[in-house]
Amino acid sequence: MASSDALAAVFAHIEDNRAAFLDRLIAYLKHPSISAENIGIDEVGALLVEMLTEIGLETRLVPTDGHPMVVARWEKAPGKPTVLLYGHYDVQPPDPLDKWVSPPFEPAIRDGRLYARGVGDNKGQHFAQILAIESHLKVHGVLPCNVILLLEGEEEIGSPHIAGFVRANTHLLKADLAITA
């Protein structure tokens, strides 16, 4: 299958599953993960491990001196490049609550747009990447490259432990290309 045809099949799968994917994103956004207040971090990290494992990635929650890192990998494309996708699963506190039109952890669609704490920074972005990986695997059974996901739980408090984590785990993060979302 030509690469444009292969990609078209993935896009068709995504379109066919659009409503279900939106429901899953909304369910994910309902989980608070406020790093500054240590609310929901462990739960969302565990949820990501479960989600990524279910779609076929080798996944683990890696402890740090702060909040854990989620590291997931699909490395079944020998000789192909490896892409590292970086994101974060923590969010800012939603205060002041009276400025929200709807509760921050009760996602709402208004005028065709989704509103929730974390949808634009950064849960929505890495969830879209996860769904793209899942879709490609469902349609083709393989990815066109190797993939590593690194999702941290401390970006919103300045990523105090990521430098040490990267230094100590370069063997886990070796990639040809890194993308931050």
Where are the model-predicted features located?
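Acidic/His- and Gly-rich active-site-bordering loop/insert found
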Residues: 2-119, 136-144
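Acidic/histidine-rich catalytic neighborhood of metal-dependent amide-processing enzymes
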Residues: 122-181
